[in-house]
Structures are given as structure tokens and as C-alpha cells.
């Protein structure tokens, strides 16, 4: 089975799915193409858990979960986690790794819009990390995430800002110079300015709570969260 056999939905980019299908078998290789995701996952998890007031006992949805790096880590925190992705191969890898790790995660192959039509208002926390820049209609994803979270629940987004610096750092630097991710992973035209993301959020029941930047230091080869959202950034919102 491949991505083309997945349920039909307008908000799917099969070329984007194919990129991740091609390298799915190496999703949990700590030195492979997804090494940056493994490196930043503790920061993402810590931010989500802190801003959401902990994850234990909460029902969590990870939108665009891929091979399950974040989904598994949230399950280890005591959350009941569902992972959504349209890539068949990444989900197979995620399911196998969860089985081998003794971690319970419910992985589902469908779009967030399809999931929202069936599970509106059912989640305490919804995460959508590094996914918005890979779909044709990111605003539709934001809208669906808002529909899925309970009143008072938390929704987290992370993506890349669209400007010259982000192109230099995320495309030229990360893909061609440092070779941290495969060439062609990112398309700067699909990057999203914070004002654009906040505009979409404002058209839903979500309210902005906090925004932070994710920064890479090539000298120390380390990542940190902090002020400045000119490249990678994370947004915490809450359902009104």
C-alpha cells in the first residue's frame, strides 16, 4: 500500500508524502535523516507538557505524527495518544516501534479534517508539529485542530517563518551545507509567517497564549528555545 491508495482528500500533497515514505524505514535512526527531530524532541515535549499543565491522564492527538517520535514521548508521559498521518510507510514504522517499545499509541491513516468530522471536541491536547508547511491548505488544518480540542484544551503548532534568514538556515544551511535533513525537504514558498498563522488562529475558537523560537547553534551543535521567531517557532493556543 502507498500514499496514493489513502483516502482521497483535497488537503493532501502526495509529493510531500512520498518524500517521507522514501526514508520512513530510517525514522528511528538517531544518526539518520531524522536526527534533528530526535534532537529537538525533548524541547518540544517539555514545552508542550509545561504549557499544557502536564500530559498525564490526558487525551492527546498528534497531527502529522510521521514515525511517532513525539507521539511515543507523550505516551510515555502518561497521555492517551492518537497519531494521525497520511503516509502509510511512516505509520507502519511508528506502529512497529511502539510495539517493540511497549508503548500504546493509536495510529490512524486519515487527514485531520476527516478526523475532526468524527471526533470534534474529544481531545485535551492537539499537537501539529512541522506539518503545516507540507500541506496545500494549512489554514484548513488549523481550523480542524480547533474543532478537535475540548473547551479549555490546548493546541500547539510549530512551523518555519518565511523570510530570507529562514531560507538560508533551513534550506541552504540545513539541507545543503550541514546536510542535517535531505535535500528537497523544505520549500520556502510554503513556510508560514507568524502573522499568517495567528490570523488563521483568530478565525477559530482558539486564542494565542504563547510563542517561542527554536534556535540552532552550529558552533555548539545544540538547540534551544527562546525569543526570536525568525526561523523555527512554536505557538501555544487554547480553546476559548
From Swiss-Prot:
Q: Sorted alphabetically, which keywords does the UniProt record give?
A: Methyltransferase, S-adenosyl-L-methionine, Transferase, Ubiquinone biosynthesis
Principal EC category: transferase
Q: Which GO terms describe its molecular function?
A: 2-polyprenyl-6-hydroxyphenol methylase activity; 3-demethylubiquinol 3-O-methyltransferase activity; polyprenyldihydroxybenzoate methyltransferase activity
Q: Which Pfam families match?
A: Methyltransf_23
**Chain residues that bind S-adenosyl-L-methionine:** 44, 64, 85, 129
What InterPro entries is this protein classified in? SAM-dependent_MTases_sf, UbiG_MeTrfase
Q: What is its EC number?
A: 2.1.1.222, 2.1.1.64
Disulfide feature: none
Q: Source organism's superkingdom?
A: Bacteria
Gene Ontology BP annotations: methylation
Q: Catalyses which reaction?
A: a 3-demethylubiquinol + S-adenosyl-L-methionine = a ubiquinol + S-adenosyl-L-homocysteine + H(+); a 3-(all-trans-polyprenyl)benzene-1,2-diol + S-adenosyl-L-methionine = a 2-methoxy-6-(all-trans-polyprenyl)phenol + S-adenosyl-L-homocysteine + H(+)
In which pathway does this enzyme or protein participate?
A: Cofactor biosynthesis; ubiquinone biosynthesis
- Function per UniProt: O-methyltransferase that catalyzes the 2 O-methylation steps in the ubiquinone biosynthetic pathway.
Which HAMAP family does this one have?
UbiG (MF_00472)
What family classification does the UniProt entry report for this protein?
Belongs to the methyltransferase superfamily. UbiG/COQ3 family.
Protein name per its UniProtKB record:
Ubiquinone biosynthesis O-methyltransferase
Amino acid at each position: 500500500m502507498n500514499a496514493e491508495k489513502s483516502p482521497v482528500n483535497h488537503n493532501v500533497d502526495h509529493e510531500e508524502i512520498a518524500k517521507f515514505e522514501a526514508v520512513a524505514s530510517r525514522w528511528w535512526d538517531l544518526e539518520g535523516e531524522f536526527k534533528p527531530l530526535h534532537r529537538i524532541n525533548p524541547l518540544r515535549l517539555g514545552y508542550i507538557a509545561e504549557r499544557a499543565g502536564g500530559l498525564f491522564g490526558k487525551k492527546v492527538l498528534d497531527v502529522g505524527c510521521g514515525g511517532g517520535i513525539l507521539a511515543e514521548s507523550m505516551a510515555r508521559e502518561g497521555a492517551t495518544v492518537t497519531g494521525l498521518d497520511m503516509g502509510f510507510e511512516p505509520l507502519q514504522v511508528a506502529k512497529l516501534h511502539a510495539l517493540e517499545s511497549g508503548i500504546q499509541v493509536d495510529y490512524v491513516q486519515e487527514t485531520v479534517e476527516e478526523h475532526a468530522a468524527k471526533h470534534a471536541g474529544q481531545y485535551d491536547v492537539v499537537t501539529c508539529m512541522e506539518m503545516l508547511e507540507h500541506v496545500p491548505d494549512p489554514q484548513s488544518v488549523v481550523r480542524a485542530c480547533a474543532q478537535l480540542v475540548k473547551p479549555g484544551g490546548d493546541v500547539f503548532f510549530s512551523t518555519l517563518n518565511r523570510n530570507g534568514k529562514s531560507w538560508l538556515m533551513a534550506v541552504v544551511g540545513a539541507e545543503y551545507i550541514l546536510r542535517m535533513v535531505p535535500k528537497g525537504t523544505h520549500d520556502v514558498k510554503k513556510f508560514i509567517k507568524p502573522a499568517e498563522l495567528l490570523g488563521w488562529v483568530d478565525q477559530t475558537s482558539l486564542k494565542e497564549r504563547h510563542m517561542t523560537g527554536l534556535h540552532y547553534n552550529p558552533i555548539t551543535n545544540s538547540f534551544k528555545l527562546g525569543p526570536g521567531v525568525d526561523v523555527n517557532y512554536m505557538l501555544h493556543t487554547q480553546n476559548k
